[in-house]
Regions:
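A common structural junction motif
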Residues: 64, 98-100, 127-132
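General beta-strand structural signal in soluble alpha/beta enzymes
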Residues: 71, 105, 113, 130-133
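Anionic-ligand-binding alpha/beta catalytic cores of soluble enzymes and soluble regulatory domains
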Residues: 1-15, 22, 122-124, 129-156
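Intrinsically disordered, low-complexity, positively charged segments
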Residues: 1-51
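Short, ordered loop/turn segments at secondary-structure junctions
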Residues: 65, 74-76, 108, 118, ...
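Conserved small/polar residues in nucleotide/adenosyl-binding loops
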Residues: 159-162
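Glycine- and charge-enriched low-complexity intrinsically disordered segments
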Residues: 85-124
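Compact, glycine-rich, soluble single-domain proteins
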Residues: 29-95, 112
Length: 162
């Protein structure tokens, strides 16, 4: 059985090495070790050193071959949220974030959450327009996410005041 042992972020892996795709919803894109079936019906073992969140367009590297399995975000029930102006959009984002709800920022400033009737009612009360449909969901990683080890550094500067 093929064994995928590492994750490569979208845009950082050689696309000519793609041998398969695997379509997974948001919940299934946070794994460490599990048997999966690619979109062509072939099984493989995901065997990562630690639980890792992978996104749409990332690749799972197959051990000992250099082959890549591209991850596709499955269409799932989502709610796209738009606001009449930027101040309202910031307020909506704050309210959604205050509920520790995964949220995707869309091009153009819209917001996407997994469809949840309670949250949809809340943002509508706050003046948002909501479009419910099925689409891939790739929320922001969050402020405390390590970014997959892609060169994230903390910097400390000391300021001397005399």
């Amino acid at each position: 059985m093929r064994r995928a042992t590492s994750v490569h972020a979208k845009g950082t892996w050689p696309q000519d090495r793609e041998v398969a795709t695997v379509t997974l919803d948001f919940e299934d894109r946070h794994r460490r070790r599990i048997r999966l079936v690619d979109d062509g019906g072939a099984d493989f073992l995901l065997d990562l050193p630690e639980a890792t969140r992978f996104g749409d367009g990332d690749a799972l590297a197959v051990a000992d071959s250099g082959d890549m399995i591209r991850v596709i975000a499955a269409a799932e029930a989502v709610a796209d949220i738009t606001a009449p102006h930027i101040d309202a959009a910031v307020k909506l984002a704050w309210h959604i974030g205050n509920r520790h709800t995964p949220m995707q920022v869309l091009p153009g400033g819209g917001l996407r959450i997994r469809d949840d009737h309670v949250l949809v009612a809340m943002v509508e009360r706050l003046g948002a327009e909501v479009h419910r449909h099925h689409a891939g969901f790739s929320p922001e990683a969050g402020a405390y996410h390590d970014g997959g080890g892609a060169g994230h550094h903390h910097h400390l500067s000391l300021i001397h005041i005399s």
